[in-house]
Amino acid sequence: MKVLWAALVVTLLAGCWADVQPEPELERELEPKVQQELEPEAGWQTGQPWEAALARFWDYLRWVQTLSDQVQEGVLNTQVTQELTALMDETMKEVKAYKAELDEQLGPMTSETQARVAKELQAAQARLRSDMEDVRNRLTQYRGELQAMLGQSSEELRARFASHMRKLRKRVLRDAEDLQRRLAVYKAGVREGAERSVSSIRERLWPLLEQARERNAKVGALATQPLLERADALGQQLRGQLEEMSSRARGHLEEMREQIQEVRVKMEEQADQIRQKAEAFQARLKSWFEPLLEDMQRQWDGLVEKVQAAVATIPTSKPVEEP
């Protein structure tokens, strides 16, 4: 923007020093009409950021159109196209941000309605962007034609360009108003869905609130009773709980006593079984080794008898006398 204003000032100063001739009568007659065509629509509202961005887009274009031929020749370059593209992108960005803000603040609608409205909004955004691109392309075309007619009369070209701009402006305003209406419908539908959700939540929470109110009423009634009565009721409740715990403890002790008795009986039975098995095993061992011992005793006795008999049969030798 600073570059454009600098070019405007330099061109105006150059025109003053060159003693430029006054504009033709036809151009002076067309200028009020062009100014009237470029005035904003009375019914157009700029309450939302995207609407303000669209207004800035048209303000910039109106400023370009109100310049003289010499100034337009100096400023209608690629930078103007870039500025218009930036303003167009800003408008589309603000539209998306506004829709996202509605979704975040008011909550989603039903899936079917949300899909249908989202599709309609996308189509309206696409039409508005297409119209703004047509404006930018028409401005680029006008710049080329203006450069081609350098040094010639451009009243007819300016009149034709103003007519095209008027038609394009009507298209842009029509599609912008359509987008406004659809966003308003979307906002109303989202609010209605949020109200239905709140009503559903209220219906679900109402019984819980009634129960809480009843409990609070009971607690309040208890709080109004005398302290002695409440203490007596609490003592009876504690006494009942202690008696219940005592009976449970006695029951557990009886069960433990019975279990210990059963264990003692089982241990005595197992000890008797072990004793009987030991006696049986001892008897079996005795039955195994007694015949063997008796046989060994007989063999030993026989061996002793044989040794004694052999010793008895050996003759005793006489002692040898010395000469």
Swiss-Prot record:
Its main location: secreted. It is found in: Secreted; Secreted, Extracellular space; Secreted, Extracellular space, Extracellular matrix; Extracellular vesicle. GO terms for cellular component: chylomicron remnant; endoplasmic reticulum; extracellular exosome; extracellular matrix; extracellular space; glutamatergic synapse; Golgi apparatus; high-density lipoprotein particle. APOE exists as multiple glycosylated and sialylated glycoforms within cells and in plasma. The extent of glycosylation and sialylation are tissue and context specific. Heparin binds at residues 168-171, 235-242. Residues 272-323 are annotated as: Homooligomerization. The modification Phosphoserine is found at residue 153. GO terms for molecular function: amyloid-beta binding; antioxidant activity; cholesterol transfer activity; enzyme binding; heparan sulfate proteoglycan binding; heparin binding; identical protein binding; lipoprotein particle binding. One of its GO terms (biological process) is negative regulation of long-term synaptic potentiation. The keyword Signal applies. Residues 1-18 form the signal peptide. Residues 284-296 are annotated as: Specificity for association with VLDL. Belongs to the apolipoprotein A1/A4/E family. APOE is an apolipoprotein, a protein associating with lipid particles, that mainly functions in lipoprotein-mediated lipid transport between organs via the plasma and interstitial fluids. APOE is a core component of plasma lipoproteins and is involved in their production, conversion and clearance. Apolipoproteins are amphipathic molecules that interact both with lipids of the lipoprotein particle core and the aqueous environment of the plasma. This is Apolipoprotein E. It comes from Canis lupus familiaris. The lineage of its organism: Eukaryota, Metazoa, Chordata, Craniata, Vertebrata.
